[in-house]
């Protein structure tokens, strides 16, 4: 029979399908040849088996059909064993057969395998693998230190196959077992049904051996198993087959949880987190590798068992030390940022180096690039937190517990001393980057309910913030994980203990956590930004001056400027990532809605329309910490300074902010802290359209904000609120805190130009006199004789006075300009006796320095350098006088200003008006007013002479003037005139005689003395009228 016929017979045999190929059938026959000869006498022929014979295909081996048929069952088993051997070789790339490859068919077997020589010797004649010895074979393969040295060719092909060598000789056993798992999965989809159980068993063996490897890694020489696990996951993420790896890991984790006798599951997995920690801490924000590691952690936070280990792993050694949280794995991630790692040290900082050598466009491109990475980074952190919150009640409790403890341990970040002692600060608390990133992630968690009309928003329960004295178990039951909030000052004092619910929802916890995080992080960074900005301006001026004078300090100043500019750009970039800002604005607008609803007594889940007058129910505000409102204001002020385009693109939501400002600015019942209410004026100034700014394509327009303001339905109530807070400023703090009061009033001026309202303000420009003296000394050369140190001190003093003078002059320009504007329409408020005295005193004091004998003291080299505009001031003051001059009471009050008024003061003012070319009608009107006031002054002089001999009982003890409305002070029991004590209390809320606290409602009229004074006055008047 020819070879062709022989092959045809094989192919027609129904049992040929048991073999992988014709060559395999021949090989099988060769293996059986000797066995059949030995057994031919013992195995009788069976006619039933003849139909299934394969003898026709084996003529060349001299076998008959009957001989093959008699041993069918044996043959079938052998065929199956042969296929199992091949399958094991394909899955595990190992073999016991090192025979000549030319004798092997090459069909169905891998091209390269690791030859297990020791095991082959041990098994002697058996050169195939089966299910009884495969586990031993796998173990032997895993113990090989260099499997690449044991590779053999399984086929006669001479083609170089590097991938086959790499796969079979894989040295890293964890990666090897994963590859075996993948090959086993593939086999399961391909093998015949009779081999399927064996393929599944092989797959299970990869899992069980991986479990063994993880439980006893010490027995595998030079194998860092946990490093391999991390590297495998890293490679899978980068190669887009991560799901395959996680499928494998899921089964391994399940197997590990079933066998914790040798090592517990956390003990097995903690080394993995150690590796991630050591690798991540050295990565930068803009390194792609960072995001692959974050994806690994994202998987771990989705996998319930790994998530538990992760949460256990990130617990700090000392929970009361805020800085320790930064050293945990989650803390290390949160610390990654474009901010400086070591404050003030720009060396080795990867961002914005040598900014003066970069064009604005290059800086903008770098900023945009960082923002892209930041957005991705914040999304990863958010997903991690979200996974842990949603995975199970246990993981939710653990991550909230961690966050609550972390914020409590870092509460000291807000203390004043913390900013003044940075070296101690950074040993005690987590970094600014930590809180900025945490805040960004928490903001994302809040977005589902950060919509003005969200019903979920109003489920926030403020009593959460005043709970105290809870143990850990109670916190878990009630879902209260924040600590120490009960020590925070609330918007108003509580009059009664609130009713606490059984537990709190996640909206309440999220809002409280997020707001406090922003308070600890964003708020502090904003303060730093402002200071950096101021220092940059100061350095720039000093650098320019040094260059002009060819000072050797110029280079040093330039270096300082470069370093500070790097810090500024890094900080600004970190704080202005667009999505974070938008999320924060969404939160703050929602907070404005929430606080307004609480302020009008709404305790339901649906918002109530705002209407005036406001209802009385607002007790819930007693449980809302002040920093909720402070954050809102601080963020909007930040946007105005550093990211104004966000305000314009979100203008429609600003109406809710206006509602908040309208209600709280003028309502001491709803917001007790006058400093906080005064700050709301700055918030209003921040969100209002600034129509005087220079148009620029890079600066957003104000069209949308203008529309919101023009259509605001509660403009009258907003103006009234501003008036109230303006008055309250006079009752705030120490009477000598001029700078603070300047800051409070400054934002009100542009607001009052834009919306009707009113205010008055007093300030001093005496600093100009000090500048004048120092400039004279400098010009005369008197400074040249000073030592360098003394000269520097003088220069610094001059610069300081110049800054102060510029600051005060801006305030004076704004104050007087606003008053001249307002008094054209509003008069009654300004002619009130208490207020009129203060306004007149201020105006006369100005005139005395602007047109009187002291005017020379205010002449400096360059008025514009200090924003000093004397001509405009004189004109505005005269306008105020003319606006209010029709009021008899006001005119009569002018001469009573004994400090600055004199009969010649107004005459000198007329002379200056002519000199600065003011209109003739204005000059004539002011001259007439001056004559009228002089007449009233003469009349008052005559009256004072008439009453000059009044007894001391009738005289005010402070002013030594005759009292018209005597009142008794409750503490000191001293009698003073009502106008005197009222004026005193505007700036100092104490009894002037014993410094006891005092308010106007505590004083009592001295009716008896008043009647005595009136009788005496009547008698004196009668005596004067009688002819001598």
From Swiss-Prot:
CDD domains: RING-Ubox_UBE4A (cd16657). It is an enzyme of class 2 (transferase). Its EC number is 2.3.2.27. Its main location: cytoplasm. One of its GO terms (molecular function) is ubiquitin-ubiquitin ligase activity. InterPro entries: Ub_conjug_fac_E4_core, UBE4, Ubox_domain, Znf_RING/FYVE/PHD. Residues 949-1023 form the U-box domain. SUPFAM superfamilies: RING/U-box. Keywords: Acetylation, Cytoplasm, Transferase, Ubl conjugation pathway. It catalyses: S-ubiquitinyl-[E2 ubiquitin-conjugating enzyme]-L-cysteine + [acceptor protein]-L-lysine = [E2 ubiquitin-conjugating enzyme]-L-cysteine + N(6)-ubiquitinyl-[acceptor protein]-L-lysine. It is found in: Cytoplasm. Pfam families: U-box (PF04564), Ufd2P_core (PF10408). Pathway: Protein modification; protein ubiquitination. Residues 33-57 are annotated as: Disordered. The modification N6-acetyllysine is found at residue 386. Coiled coil: none annotated. Signal peptide: none annotated. Belongs to the ubiquitin conjugation factor E4 family. The U-box domain is required for the ubiquitin protein ligase activity. Ubiquitin-protein ligase that probably functions as an E3 ligase in conjunction with specific E1 and E2 ligases. May also function as an E4 ligase mediating the assembly of polyubiquitin chains on substrates ubiquitinated by another E3 ubiquitin ligase. Mediates 'Lys-48'-linked polyubiquitination of substrates. This is Ubiquitin conjugation factor E4 A. It comes from Mus musculus.
């Amino acid at each position: 029979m020819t070879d062709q016929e022989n092959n045809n017979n094989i192919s027609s045999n129904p049992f040929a399908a048991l073999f992988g190929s014709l060559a395999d059938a021949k090989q099988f026959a060769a293996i059986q040849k000797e066995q059949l000869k030995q057994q031919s006498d013992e195995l009788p022929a069976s006619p039933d088996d003849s139909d299934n014979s394969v003898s026709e295909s084996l003529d060349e081996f001299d076998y008959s059909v009957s001989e093959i048929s008699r041993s069918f069952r044996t043959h079938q088993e052998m065929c199956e064993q042969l296929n199992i051997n091949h399958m094991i070789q394909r899955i595990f790339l190992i073999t016991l057969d090192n025979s000549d490859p030319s004798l092997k068919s090459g069909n169905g077997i891998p091209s390269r395998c690791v030859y297990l020589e020791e095991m082959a010797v041990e098994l002697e004649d058996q050169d195939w693998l089966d299910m009884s010895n495969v586990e031993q074979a796998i173990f032997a393969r895993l113990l090989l230190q260099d499997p690449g040295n044991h590779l053999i060719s399984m086929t006669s092909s001479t083609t170089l196959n590097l991938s086959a060598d790499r796969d079979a000789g894989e040295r890293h056993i964890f990666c090897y077992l994963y590859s075996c798992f993948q090959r086993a999965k593939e086999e399961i989809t391909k093998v015949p049904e009779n081999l399927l159980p064996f393929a599944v068993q092989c797959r299970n063996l990869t899992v069980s051996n991986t479990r063994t490897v993880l439980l006893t890694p010490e027995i595998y020489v030079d194998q860092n198993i946990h490093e391999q696990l991390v590297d495998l996951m890293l490679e899978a993420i980068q190669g887009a087959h991560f799901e395959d790896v996680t499928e494998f890991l899921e089964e391994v984790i399940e197997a590990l949880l079933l066998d914790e006798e040798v090592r517990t599951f956390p003990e097995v997995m903690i080394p993995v987190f150690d590796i991630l920690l050591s690798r991540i801490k050295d990565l930068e924000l803009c390194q792609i590798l960072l995001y692959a590691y974050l994806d690994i952690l994202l998987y771990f936070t989705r996998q319930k068992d790994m998530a538990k280990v992760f949460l256990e792993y990130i617990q700090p050694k000392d929970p009361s030390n805020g800085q320790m949280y930064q050293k945990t794995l989650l803390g290390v991630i949160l610390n990654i940022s474009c901010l400086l790692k070591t404050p003030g040290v720009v060396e080795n900082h990867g961002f914005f180096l040598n900014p003066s050598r970069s064009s604005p466009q290059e800086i903008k491109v770098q900023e945009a690039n960082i923002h892209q990475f930041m957005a991705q980074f914040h999304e990863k952190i958010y997903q991690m937190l979200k996974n842990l919150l949603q995975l199970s009640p246990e993981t939710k409790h653990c991550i909230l517990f961690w966050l609550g403890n972390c914020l409590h341990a870092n509460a000291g970040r807000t203390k004043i001393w913390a900013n003044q002692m940075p070296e101690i600060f950074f040993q005690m608390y987590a970094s600014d980057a930590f809180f900025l990133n945490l805040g960004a992630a928490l903001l994302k968690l809040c977005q589902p309910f950060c919509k003005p009309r969200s019903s979920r928003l109003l489920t926030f329960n403020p009593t959460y913030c005043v709970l105290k004295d809870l143990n850990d178990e109670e916190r878990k039951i009630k879902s209260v994980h924040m600590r120490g909030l009960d020590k925070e000052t609330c918007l108003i004092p509580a009059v009664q203990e609130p009713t606490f619910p059984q537990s709190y929802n996640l909206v309440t916890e999220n809002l409280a956590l997020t707001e406090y995080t922003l308070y600890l992080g964003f708020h502090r960074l904003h303060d730093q930004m402002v200071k950096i900005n101021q220092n940059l301006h100061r350095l720039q001026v000093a650098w320019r001056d040094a260059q002009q004078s060819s000072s050797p300090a110029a280079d040093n100043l330039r270096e300082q400027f470069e370093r500070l500019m790097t810090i500024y750009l890094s900080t600004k970039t970190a704080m202005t990532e667009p999505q974070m800002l938008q999320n924060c604005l969404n939160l703050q607008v929602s907070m404005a809605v929430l606080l307004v609803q609480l302020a009008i007594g709404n305790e339901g889940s649906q918002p109530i329309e705002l209407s005036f007058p406001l209802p009385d129910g607002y007790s819930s505000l007693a449980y809302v910490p002040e920093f909720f409102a402070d954050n809102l204001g601080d963020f909007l002020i930040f946007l105005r300074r550093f990211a104004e385009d966000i305000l314009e693109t979100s203008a429609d939501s600003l109406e809710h902010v206006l509602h908040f400002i309208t209600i709280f600015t003028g309502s001491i019942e709803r917001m007790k802290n006058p400093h906080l209410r005064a700050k709301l004026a700055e918030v209003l100034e921040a969100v209002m359209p600034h129509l005087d700014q220079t148009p620029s394509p890079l600066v957003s327009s104000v069209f949308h904000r203008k529309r919101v303001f023009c259509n605001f339905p509660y403009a009258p109530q907003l103006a009234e609120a501003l008036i109230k807070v303006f008055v309250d400023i006079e009752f705030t703090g120490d009477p000598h805190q001029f700078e603070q009061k300047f800051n409070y009033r400054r934002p009100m001026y542009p607001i009052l130009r834009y919306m009707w309202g009113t205010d008055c303000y007093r300030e001093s420009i005496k600093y100009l006199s000090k500048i004048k003296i120092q400039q004279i000394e400098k010009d005369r050369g008197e400074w040249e004789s000073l030592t360098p140190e003394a000269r520097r001190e003088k220069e610094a003093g001059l610069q300081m006075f110049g800054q102060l003078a510029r600051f005060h002059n801006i305030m004076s320009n704004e104050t007087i300009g606003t008053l001249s504007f307002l008094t054209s329409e509003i008069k009654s408020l300004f002619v009130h006796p208490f207020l009129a005295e203060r306004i007149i005193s201020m105006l006369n004091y100005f005139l005395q320095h602007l047109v009187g004998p002291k005017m020379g003291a205010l002449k400096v080299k360059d008025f514009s350098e200090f924003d000093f505009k004397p001509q405009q001031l004189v004109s505005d003051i005269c306008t105020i006088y003319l606006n209010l001059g029709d009021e008899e009471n006001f005119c009569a009050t002018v001469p009573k200003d004994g400090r600055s008024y004199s009969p010649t003061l107004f005459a000198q003012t007329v002379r200056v008006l002519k000199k600065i070319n003011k209109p003739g009608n204005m000059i004539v009107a002011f001259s007439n007013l001056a004559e009228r006031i002089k007449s009233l002054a003469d009349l008052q002089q005559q009256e004072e002479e008439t009453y000059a001999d009044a007894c001391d009982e009738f005289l005010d003890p402070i002013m030594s003037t005759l009292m018209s409305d005597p009142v008794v002070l409750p503490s000191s029991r001293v009698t003073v005139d009502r106008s005197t004590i009222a004026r005193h209390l505007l700036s100092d809320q104490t009894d002037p005689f014993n410094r006891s606290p005092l308010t106007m409602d505590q004083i009592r009229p001295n009716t008896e003395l008043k009647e005595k004074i009136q009788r005496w006055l009547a008698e004196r008047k009668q005596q004067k009228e009688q002819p001598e």
